[in-house]
Design a protein with these regions (language model features):
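Core segments of cupin and vicinal oxygen chelate
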Residues: 1-46, 91, 111
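Vicinal oxygen chelate
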Residues: 6, 19, 44-48, 52-124
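Short beta->alpha transition motifs characteristic of CBS
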Residues: 130-135
Length: 135
């Protein structure tokens, strides 16, 4: 939670214990206790992430990831301060794949988008592409 709050600037929208029913979630068992934190961006309609921690019993940590593979998740985020986000990420001790760099890509409407992009891993080894658009 601290990484998403202090580095990426998200705020807590929900934070509570959830006891699993054993039905809806494809992990854990009935009665397992979890903590669910939902973080929101400036626009919660298109920018929320749920962080689920198994608290009782604790589940083993997955092995660290160094590269993306088939089926892996990439979080794509947009903000207005790629340089500041990079500085906060370095101060936090996050693994940086690529510091802020200029990037151009064709947008959904066919027009070129100019961005400063930052590529990094969160503390749970999920890959994040943080983009600052220059319109």
């Amino acid at each position: 939670m601290a990484f998403y709050r202090d580095v990426l600037g998200l705020s807590v929208w929900y934070d509570d214990e959830v006891v699993l029913s054993g039905v809806g979630l494809a992990a854990g068992d009935r009665g397992d206790r979890t903590r669910l934190v939902i973080m929101k961006c400036q626009d919660p309609t298109v920018g929320m992430i749920g962080l689920l921690e198994f608290t009782e019993p604790r589940l083993p940590e997955p092995p660290p990831r160094e590269r993306l593979g088939i089926g892996d998740i990439v979080f794509v985020m947009q903000g207005d301060d790629a340089q500041g986000t990079w500085e906060r990420a370095v101060g936090f001790g996050a693994r940086i794949h690529a510091p802020p760099h200029e990037f151009r890509v064709r947008g959904a409407d066919g027009r070129e988008l100019r961005m400063t992009s930052l590529s990094l891993w969160d503390p749970d080894d999920y890959f994040i592409e943080y983009n600052q658009r220059h319109d």
